[in-house]
């Protein structure tokens, strides 16, 4: 037992060291503010810990003397854990899809399904037990028996009892209380943190009234989250999180649209105004004297002043073509642009082509959901389709170019062009709205300003004014 305790202690501290256990203030999916967040997705990049977790899950099942024929991991974090267990111990594995595909086999369960077999469910973390139960229901519809589930961490918020009431025994490698005890003993966290987390657990249990009810989730109307809080949401893309954090740090939600034709002017704008902005948007194909050396200088300035570079390319072709446009040609956009954007018109292939290039480089994309020009066709069902496409490709798409908030998911960013301090328009159909209108009333996150700053006699003062107006509109929105 002492050896097992030492092994568990080593695993828990190892997981803490790779930030799988985070303590602070985190907004959960339900809208609750939690003092602890468990995120095991990162262990896929740490084979030693991944293997250790998988083996401890298997040993937990062995110690409980569970009889089973197959294993199914709850998508998605538990999938690699289930794969290692099955591969190491030569056990047949099943994969549950989150949604049925409209092509191929169209099955929700992949693998050799033998009705009457008993399937063991593997999960990383259990709160209410809903994720385990959803997987069990799908397996049972295929004629499989589900009697047990093993989990790395039981958050002790009612999941064990809820599953027991539905005929599923939950076996955990450890509970959250055990994690707290180990980390306090190792001086990773203090007693105050331990008490805060324990109080949260006690006050936020998920308990169903009877076994026939669907498993509960805490319902709470989420309030407007700060940029900083949104950066820490588990579903926020790393590029979006980076942008949100620097917005919070610099207190700016201003994107400068530097639509200039000379590289020298572009670099001067970036250097002079970089400290006031969160994003620099450019059209690289209108630079008369483009070179990759200019882009190197621009990325150096971006690091110095802490802003991201957004190439306003508006890709709108088939996947294979946009892939070549993104990574190759004269501009080699993927090598220097943190963000690009694309139209939804070509269908999901445009995103798939871009993400083949961008994902390995830690880049991201915005979809054009609405436009600020008069007579735009990007409205209604087109906008809805763009939102759906973003949700289906959230591993690469981090938000939208839009005139207003088109998605209620706080993980997505909304950037709005056509902003001036006073509403109006130009003779080419551009329509302008004020920062207060765009941020305060329409729910956008970032204003995109070009001529309002660049055409000003004092560009720095103009940038300060736009930054102040947009940030104050954001703060007012938080206060509502």
From Swiss-Prot:
SMART domains: OMPdecase. Disulfide bonds: none annotated. The modification Phosphoserine is found at residue 214. Pfam families: OMPdecase (PF00215), Pribosyltran (PF00156). PROSITE patterns: OMPDECASE, PUR_PYR_PR_TRANSFER. Its EC number is 2.4.2.10, 4.1.1.23. InterPro entries: Aldolase_TIM, OMPdecase, OMPdecase_AS, OMPdeCOase_dom, OPRT, Or_phspho_trans_dom, PRibTrfase_dom, PRTase-like. Bifunctional enzyme catalyzing the last two steps of de novo pyrimidine biosynthesis, orotate phosphoribosyltransferase (OPRT), which converts orotate to orotidine-5'-monophosphate (OMP), and orotidine-5'-monophosphate decarboxylase (ODC), the terminal enzymatic reaction that decarboxylates OMP to uridine monophosphate (UMP). This is Uridine 5'-monophosphate synthase. It comes from Bos taurus.
